[in-house]
Amino acid sequence: MNYHGLVKRLDLPAGWMAPAELEYDDIRARAISRADNDDDVRGINASIELIRRTRGGSWPTGPVSTDFNYVDEVWHECEFREGDSFTYAVYDSRGHYLGCCYLYPVGRRTPLTEELLEYDVDVSWWVTPGAYERGYYTKLYVALRHWIESAFPFMKAHYSNAEIPELPG
């Protein structure tokens, strides 16, 4: 079957609400909102090449403006509220911006294929260069795995980043 352009919607229990805040070790994630715009714009614009290398894909195509990103964050807020996808701004426990993580329907970010049908969420993330140097890329991956298992109703997550960290045995 040709799945080109199809998206497998998130299958959420009736009445289930995604957590607005998540914590793991010294990582704090909160549902992204317009209040995160300045941090997010600075983070994206400082991280373009790192995002492309680690998360993969073609976004961002270049620096983002405050106005453009504001519209994007309003869209993420609406998607979160409707349960269509979940985007989080990520900070450390001291309030320093680290990056973002995304829980999307399979097929939105990565083209849907027969092999991907078994997954019920597409998980991706990125961190700023400073956060990457301090090991937060791997730490956020560990946190995401924990949150998917403990805070979300997903049975099988597809971690779609181009660079997937190796976890200690």
What do the PLM-derived regions correspond to, one by one?
Residues 1-130, 143-169:
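GNAT-family acyltransferases
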Residues 131-139:
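Glycine-centered recognition micro-motifs in short, flexible terminal segments and loops
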